Curated annotation (Swiss-Prot):
Residues 84-88 are annotated as: Connecting peptide. Has a two-domain beta-structure, folded into four very similar Greek key motifs. Disulfide bonds: none annotated. It holds the Pfam family Crystall. The keyword Repeat applies. This is Gamma-crystallin B. SUPFAM superfamilies: gamma-Crystallin-like. PROSITE patterns: CRYSTALLIN_BETA_GAMMA. Belongs to the beta/gamma-crystallin family. It comes from Rattus norvegicus (Rat). Crystallins are the dominant structural components of the vertebrate eye lens.
Length: 175
């Protein structure tokens, strides 16, 4: 079970809302979000309702302003609690759509896709075990995308506008 608290103002000030499960529309609870406290669990925050728009991965900790979670603005409109996973993590990445081209099987975090695999794009992937977060840039920076177990035949399937991937990591309650 997870627990996250959203605050309208920076520094954990202003009106707040506590949440312990997925919420497709947070607009009724607050108009803006400038700070967040994650008491337990790992969460994905979304800038628009129904889990749309920019995504932000947060784990246990305090985030006194939206820049701490690499936010582009104070707009958080939905959130999803990421299920805990205690087993192994496995994902296959492909250089082309529909699981074609060079394939690599992944079981751990990758700080730089370019350095490790000599790739800058992933066009399709298959998450076999665990949840992962893809980052647009190396060193876990840039736009973020939550990947749950399943097949992603093209980058549009995970919500990206292009195939550019710089890094990725397993969703774990500790780093």
């Amino acid at each position: 079970m997870g627990k996250i608290t959203f605050f309208e103002d920076r520094g954990f000030q202003g009106r707040c809302y506590e949440c312990s499960s997925d919420c497709p529309n947070l607009q009724t609870y607050f108009s803006r979000c400038n700070s967040v406290r994650v008491d337990s669990g790992c969460w994905m925050l979304y800038e628009r309702p129904n889990y749309q728009g920019h995504q932000y991965f947060l784990r246990r900790g305090d985030y006194p302003d939206y820049q701490q979670w690499m936010g582009f603005s104070d707009s958080i409109r939905s959130c999803r609690l990421i299920p805990q996973h205690s087993g192994t993590y496995r994902m296959r990445i492909y250089e082309r759509d529909d699981f074609r081209g060079q394939m690599s099987e992944i079981t751990d975090d990758c700080l730089s896709l370019q350095d490790r695999f000599h790739l800058s794009e992933i066009h399709s992937l298959n998450v076999m075990e665990g949840c992962w977060v893809l980052y647009e840039m190396p060193s876990y920076r840039g736009r973020q995308y939550l990947l749950r177990p399943g097949e992603y035949r093209r980058y549009l399937d995970w919500g990206a506008a292009n195939a550019k991937v710089g890094s990725f990591r397993r969703v774990m309650d500790f780093y």
